[in-house]
């Protein structure tokens, strides 16, 4: 599902809310989440999961085109850990 598909589905469910307002709400929610992670803070949505940053240590990589080894710097990467309810739901029979 893409962001635009999510906006469309939510706008269909909440017909009393203009589609543009749904779009603005989704974009603002994602922006707030990005800013929170950028500050190094954790986001927890009970029943859904949590977002945090994990540190990837510096390592030696390889350029796939040339085969040459390359030093890669350490960096923080976003990490999502699903909550118990979400894990249980995805293990139920999949909806077609």
From Swiss-Prot:
Region annotation Disordered: where it falls in the sequence: 59-86
GO molecular-function terms, A-Z: DNA binding; structural constituent of chromatin
Annotated Basic and acidic residues bias: 72-86
Superkingdom field: Bacteria
One of the GO biological process terms: DNA recombination
Pfam families: Bac_DNA_binding (PF00216)
UniProt-listed SUPFAM superfamilies: IHF-like DNA-binding proteins
Entry GO CC: chromosome; cytosol
PANTHER family for this protein: DNA-BINDING PROTEIN HU, INTEGRATION HOST FACTOR SUBUNIT BETA
Function description: This protein is one of the two subunits of integration host factor, a specific DNA-binding protein that functions in genetic recombination as well as in transcriptional and translational control.
Family: Belongs to the bacterial histone-like protein family.
Protein name: Integration host factor subunit beta
Organism, scientific name: Pseudoalteromonas atlantica (strain T6c / ATCC BAA-1087)
């Amino acid at each position: 599902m893409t962001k635009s598909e999510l906006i469309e589905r939510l706008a269909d469910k909440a017909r009393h809310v203009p589609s543009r307002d749904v779009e603005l709400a989704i974009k603002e929610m994602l922006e707030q989440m990005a800013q929170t992670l950028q500050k190094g803070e954790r986001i927890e949505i009970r029943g859904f999961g949590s977002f945090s940053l994990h540190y990837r240590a510096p390592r030696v990589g390889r350029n796939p085109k040339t085969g040459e080894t390359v030093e890669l710097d350490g960096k923080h990467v976003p990490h999502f850990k699903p909550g118990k309810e979400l894990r249980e739901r995805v293990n139920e029979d999949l909806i077609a």
